Amino acid sequence: MSDAADKVADQLAILVARIKERMIEGGVVRSDETYIRYLDRIIPGGSARGYFWVYRGLDGDVIFDWQTSREHHHLADWLGADFEGILQSDGYEAYERYCELQRRRGKDVRRAACLAHIRRKFEKALKERPALVRWILKIIGRLYRTEAMLREHRAPPEVRARVRQNLSRPLIRLLGKAFRHLRATAILPKSTLGQALNYALGQWSAMETYLEDGRIEIDNNDTENDIRPSAVSKKNWLFIGHPEAGRRSAILYTLLISARNHGIDPQAYLKDVIERLPSMRPADLDALLPSAWAAAHRAKHPLAKPDRTATAA
């Protein structure tokens, strides 16, 4: 990144802080992480792995948080000791440990799992037991068809929860019972299928969270999609030039990807924000958040189509 971009990112940090406040207040955070190498002269070999920890809120806002490791405390430091609500993630143990820590503090925190990660584990085991794994994938497919129907009808959270209780809960229970039976039989624990079963059962309690709360998605794919632009840059850049550059990259990613998720042109949004931010009063800064900017843009241009690069929140 250029020096000019570094300075801009520092100015934009105040907006990222406000997005974080609103996300935490919303009570639902979806998280994932991805790595990219960074350069640092004080490290043997001159480079190491850094990580973008990514957090997504209910409305499509996304925050990229740069850290130089994948250590568990980064998650706890970001969410804080007062967070209550639902944390959706894959099976990386940092997420469940944070939820357990919060519950010991007397906080109402639950974790929601990701069915897409579970499905991928079984897809890898397809060659070992084709008929059995196809049956498992068929049941998972039925769960996803229910979600597609709910999206098609734009069902509100309370309807989603009700439909899931009627249609999806019996299938979740059926799969859980089947997984426990299979693990207790002759499936080798170290086989691909055995590993898939162990992973699924380790996630199954958290998998039921989406049945109970209609705000939650069946998987964490939206958050994974948010990470993909950084993966593209990772191929282009090969590395981040310095740990501090990682922090500034995270600030820009936060605003650009959030803008995209709200259906607006990220470049047009960022250009306008950079021009207006220096003269804005602190009390008026919320108008520059991606969600507010998108709403104002739609009010001015009611017939304009959403930017094609945007994804549904």
Model-identified regions with their sequence ranges:
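Catalytic center-proximal scaffold of phosphoryl-transfer enzymes
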Residues: 1-313
